[in-house]
């Protein structure tokens, strides 16, 4: 894995991430104009970064945040649709893959139900090869309908890619799910705002380290009249070290070459920090020395995960017992979220 050049090779995937300035849009026509701007940016970037195999744009970069619910429903896209057609044409012309945000994608029961928050991975032939719907929307603010699974797709030069979105990345479970499905590069597109800059930079690095995987983060920048976005789009090696990171600048770009052979060699031959292998071969050294086989223990030792899988309602009740029983909070109401029932306070 290398940083500082504009090239790539048969063994390296050239990945660019963009601090796209958060747009403030109100209509389908404005969304399509912005999509065309993104398309032109891709073509320009390819001239400057001839090794670029994959370009990643942040969450909300296509549509912005539609703070008006009627505008959000009116601009919700179909996939494929007008927006993806623009992106597909740009990927073909620039001979590159791209990750793009659709906020939102029409629900199957549109307009009766809220849209999804969706990413698409488009290959260099203009084909949509992965569509991911955000599993963990940023409640209580985001009103997206949640998705229900992650995916892994063979990307440029065979690198295996998963997509996640913003608040998804605050939950170690989703990173592990992607990695255990075989993802070598986890792409996190986010529209993350202050104050949580330090926490988000730290989370991406920690999850790369914990999952022996590359991480590409594309985050919004600028101010949209409501939130201030901190940028810091970054590329992180599978050892948790940052290869390149933007600052807060609008339209900042970082680029690095991610080696396919190096991550596969590390996953096969690293030992003390091979977290994926060791999690499913717990204590293999001591068990081997004890004459109890050479595979360690594969069984899950974590009671919470057992309960969640076997009895999700019980797991929900358990977490409510230590947090709260309503989705709203009486001391700081958000919208019309219900706050019936007694809320916990410090010391109770």
Swiss-Prot record:
Catalyzes the hydrolysis of short-chain aliphatic amides to their corresponding organic acids with release of ammonia. Also exhibits in vitro acyl transferase activity, transferring the acyl moiety of short-chain amides to hydroxylamine to form hydroxamates. InterPro entries: Aliph_Amidase/BUP, Aliphatic_amidase, C-N_Hydrolase, C-N_Hydrolase_sf. It is an enzyme of class 3 (hydrolase). The keyword Hydrolase applies. Belongs to the carbon-nitrogen hydrolase superfamily. Aliphatic amidase family. The active site is at residues 59, 134, 166. PROSITE patterns: CN_HYDROLASE. It catalyses: a monocarboxylic acid amide + H2O = a monocarboxylate + NH4(+). Its EC number is 3.5.1.4. It comes from the Bacteria. Keywords: Hydrolase. Signal peptide: none annotated. Residues 13-260 form the CN hydrolase domain. Gene3D superfamilies: Carbon-nitrogen hydrolase. HAMAP family: Aliphatic_amidase. GO terms for molecular function: amidase activity. This is Aliphatic amidase. Pfam families: CN_hydrolase. SUPFAM superfamilies: Carbon-nitrogen hydrolase. The gene is amiE. Transmembrane segments: none annotated.
């Amino acid at each position: 894995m290398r940083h500082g050049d504009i090239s790539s090779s048969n063994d390296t995937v050239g990945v660019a991430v963009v601090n796209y300035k958060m747009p403030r849009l109100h209509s389908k026509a404005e969304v399509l104009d912005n999509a065309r701007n993104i398309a032109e940016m891709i073509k320009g970037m390819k001239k400057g970064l001839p090794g670029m195999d994959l370009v990643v744009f942040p969450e909300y970069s296509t549509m912005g945040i539609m703070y008006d619910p009627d505008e959000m429903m009116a601009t919700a896209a179909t996939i494929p649709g007008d927006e993806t057609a623009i992106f597909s044409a740009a990927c073909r012309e620039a001979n590159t893959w791209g990750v793009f945000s659709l906020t939102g994608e029409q629900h199957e029961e549109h307009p009766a139900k809220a849209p999804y928050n969706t990413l698409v991975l488009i290959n260099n032939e203009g084909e949509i090869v992965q569509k991911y719907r955000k599993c963990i929307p940023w409640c209580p603010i985001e009103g997206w309908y949640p998705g229900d699974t992650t995916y892994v797709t063979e990307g440029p030069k065979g690198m295996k890619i998963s997509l996640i979105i913003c608040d998804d990345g605050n939950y170690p479970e989703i990173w592990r799910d992607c990695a255990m499905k075989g993802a070598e590069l986890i792409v996190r597109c986010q529209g993350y705002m202050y104050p949580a800059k330090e926490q988000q930079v730290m989370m991406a690095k920690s999850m790369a380290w914990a999952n022996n995987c590359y991480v590409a983060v594309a985050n919004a920048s600028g101010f949209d009249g409501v939130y201030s976005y901190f940028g810091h789009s970054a590329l992180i090696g599978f050892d948790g070290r940052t290869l390149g990171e933007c600052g807060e600048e609008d339209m900042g770009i970082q680029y690095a070459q991610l080696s396919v052979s190096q991550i596969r060699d590390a996953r096969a031959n690293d030992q003390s920090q091979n977290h994926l292998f060791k999690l499913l071969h717990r204590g293999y050294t001591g068990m081997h020395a004890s004459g109890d086989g050479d595979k360690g223990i594969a069984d899950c030792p974590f009671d919470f995960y057992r309960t969640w899988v076997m009895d999700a309602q019980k797991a929900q009740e358990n977490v409510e017992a230590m947090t709260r029983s309503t989705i709203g909070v009486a001391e700081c109401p958000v919208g019309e979220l219900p706050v019936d029932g007694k809320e916990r306070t410090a010391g109770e």
